[in-house]
UniProtKB/Swiss-Prot annotation:
Pathway: Carbohydrate degradation; glycolysis; pyruvate from D-glyceraldehyde 3-phosphate: step 3/5
Disulfide linkage: none
PANTHER family: PHOSPHOGLYCERATE MUTASE
EC number: 5.4.2.11
PROSITE patterns found in the cross-reference section: PG_MUTASE
NCBIfam families, alphabetized: pgm_1, PRK14115.1, PRK14120.1
Top-level taxon of origin: Bacteria
Protein name: 2,3-bisphosphoglycerate-dependent phosphoglycerate mutase
UniProt-annotated site: Transition state stabilizer, residues: H182
Keywords: Gluconeogenesis, Glycolysis, Isomerase
Pfam families according to UniProt: His_Phos_1
């Protein structure tokens, strides 16, 4: 049996402002920093000591991991970073206000773009101020892998190779693994772990800053579907807040 802990980054500045973020590298808000500290405290109180962290290339996830580890007294453990754990790329919606987008395009189109499994938003122009095409952190990424927009199915496809090639080997070695990532990269992983169908995944929301713990069997399937949040009541309240974004 092995232990996998999933932690969505704390509230970002753009989360607080109600903007679509995607691959834009915004920082944590003060509330998000406190959520990251809470995540670290919850890990310490539960006696969970990760041996290794996997995170994205975006500072809101990296800083969440760093703050949580500092709070738990585990700032020294190794951290591995990959673009495959980045947030879903929201295409031309990046930088746009969610409520205004909903008002402009209507509830149905808004929810299709936000929660449909296989329908991406319009692509982002390469000359957009929110484009990552000249970002040095992606300099070694083959151009054909650099997204201009993504649906959740795209995130699943890019995330799964990392699950098999990087995370599972750590779990197989007996390490407790913390994945500090994003709402949609974690939804993609939970979809795989819990074998959630393409339609039902639309109803899954991941709260910020509350560790979700999976105890895994020897074949890396969950012993309990859905795992367990270390603060179930706070998670329930935060999930409702995520669900209501853009209203």
């Amino acid at each position: 049996m092995s232990t996998l802990v999933l932690l969505r980054h704390g509230e970002s500045v753009w989360n607080a402002e109600g903007l679509f973020t995607g691959w834009v590298d915004v920082d944590l808000s003060p509330k998000g920093e406190e959520e990251a500290r809470r995540g670290g405290r919850l890990l310490a109180e539960a006696g969970i000591r990760p041996d290794v962290v996997h995170t994205s290339l975006l500072k809101r996830a990296i800083r969440t991991a760093n703050i949580a580890l500092e709070e738990a007294g585990l700032h020294w453990i190794p951290v591995k970073r990959s673009w495959r754990l980045n947030e879903r790329h929201y295409g031309a919606l990046q930088g746009k206000n969610k409520a205004q987008t909903r008002a402009e395009f209507g509830d149905e189109q808004f929810m299709i773009w936000r929660r449909s499994y296989d329908t991406p938003p319009p692509p982002l122009a390469e000359d957009s101020e929110f484009s990552q095409h000249n970002d040095p952190r992606y300099a070694t990424l083959p151009p054909e892998l650099m997204p201009r927009t993504e649906c959740l199915a795209d995130v699943v496809r890019r995330m799964l190779p990392y699950w098999y090639d990087a995370i599972i080997p750590d779990l197989a070695a007996g390490r407790t693994v913390l994945v500090a990532a994003h709402g949609n990269s974690l939804r993609a992983l939970v979809k795989h772990l819990d074998n959630i169908d393409d339609k039902s995944i639309a109803g899954l929301n991941i709260p910020t800053g509350i560790p979700l713990v999976y105890e895994l069997n020897d074949d890396f399937t969950p012993r309990k579907t859905g795992g367990e949040y270390l603060d179930p009541e706070a998670a329930k309240e935060a999930i409702e807040a995520v669900k209501n974004q853009g209203k």
